[in-house]
């Protein structure tokens, strides 16, 4: 069924069907975030632009090529402070530092993505006016979070944000945009003066992705975003948890793999890196880590507390090992996923259009498949694909 649906999307020009993707490993570099305080708001810097350049140089020396690097919280004020500011934070190195990093990335085959979220705005953002620029609920009140710090941009303000981002970020070099928010959430606006149905917002999202250019990336990966995005950040790894489901099938990934690169969950946020690695293989996802130059303990007095272990010096060796594993004998970045089958319990067979066949064993005991032993909590490449044979 996934194969048939993929072919349908290709015929509809929603997927390009190029049967190949580019990213080998994805690193999200978290730059910084404001502190939480009543009287003084400081800035915690976890990675500067020069730090990022040094980190990329380290991976280059280790032979890690084809990196996709996402900068998160690079704007003025850091992550979450001034979401619609598209000027680089001066304390991270400013415009000069970002342009230098951009040049280094371009010269060394690294794809650099600047993450933005034009859908969310904060109370102190530019000429932000509650009610005029925000989405309203049925009672006419602005839609906001529990702390009333963030609001959702209405269609007029959203469009201004994206066009502003395209203009500003173009000044910093060849970096592409990763547009968060609008690729994963569709909402309506019930305001009396600027009402919009969900389908109208979706049409706007599509037009904004189209204006952003062919090298735009998106988060979440809703269907309308796939047509315009060649990379999807954090595609769904979970299921709908419906009571009628008795098995987890990577339906989304089976449809998309081979047309777009995508990530699922970060390796350094998983309680078991080996388990997450198996999930990447099963789902055809690119290895993905969110890292920092500094120890993430510095984030304890901020609103960004989900990073428990991210210091690059601690993760570099593991990242390099996984890169070599995924891009050596296990090369699954290209080709459609044409079959996903449960062999027994938590033992899965995945087949690719390239001819590759992989058996993943999530159980605590070895599994015998066609005379091959698949070790417990491990995988075995049963048949190599055409790409692997050429290497």
Model-identified regions with their sequence ranges:
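Beta-strand-rich recognition/accessory modules
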Residues: 1-33, 283, 288, 300-308
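Active-site-proximal substrate-binding groove within the catalytic cores of carbohydrate-active enzymes
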Residues: 108, 118-121, 125-175, 183-391
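Conserved beta-strand positions
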Residues: 69-72, 179-181, 218
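Hydrophilic extracytoplasmic domains
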Residues: 1, 47, 102, 166-170
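Intrinsically disordered or highly flexible coil/loop and linker segments, enriched in small
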Residues: 14-15, 65, 111, 332
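Aromatic-lined carbohydrate-binding/catalytic grooves of carbohydrate-active enzymes
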Residues: 20-160
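Short loop/turn motifs at secondary-structure junctions
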Residues: 63-66, 172-174, 178
